[in-house]
Amino acid sequence: MNTILLGNLIKIRWIAITGQFTAIFFAALILNIKIPIVETFIVVLLSVIINFYSYFEERKNKTISNIKAFSYLLFDTLQLGILLFLTGGIINPFSILILAPVITSASYLPATLTVILSLISILIIISLNFYYIPLDLGTEFYLPQI
């Protein structure tokens, strides 16, 4: 049983949610990148709902089992995988963040669960190399004359 983990997961997820909303709106409104705003908003909003549930769960019970902690980190991994699918796949500069739940898992959970989460992350990364919605940057790519 991990006594601190749920509170830490809640804090980490709030940071991730803030970063995700900021990146989505910055890309769409400032950089004029055409991304599926409604779909990405729904995916991040689901994370907000899960985090509120976790917050009220923590108020009732400070301890959390390894399996429950793993399920939270698995959700975070899948949620980020869906966001990356919607926003350009593996070429998205934020794709490296798929490692964050694995690193958190390595810090708190047994090696077996960390290996399982690592394998799932690897499968997501490989899938994102082939299946994703390409970003429409609104401009043609060209090389300047030298």
Residues of each region from the PLM?
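Core segments of transmembrane alpha-helices
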Residues: 17-21, 74-80
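Membrane-embedded alpha-helical segments of multi-pass membrane proteins
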Residues: 44-49, 74-78, 93-101, 146
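Canonical alpha-helical transmembrane segments
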Residues: 47-62
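Short, Lys/Arg-rich, polar N-terminal cytosolic tail immediately upstream
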Residues: 1-5
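Alpha-helical transmembrane segments and their interfaces in multipass membrane proteins
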Residues: 6, 18, 22-44, 60-69, ...
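Generic transmembrane alpha-helix motif of multi-pass integral membrane proteins
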Residues: 79-90, 96-116
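Alpha-helical transmembrane segments of multi-pass membrane proteins
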Residues: 47-51, 103-106, 125
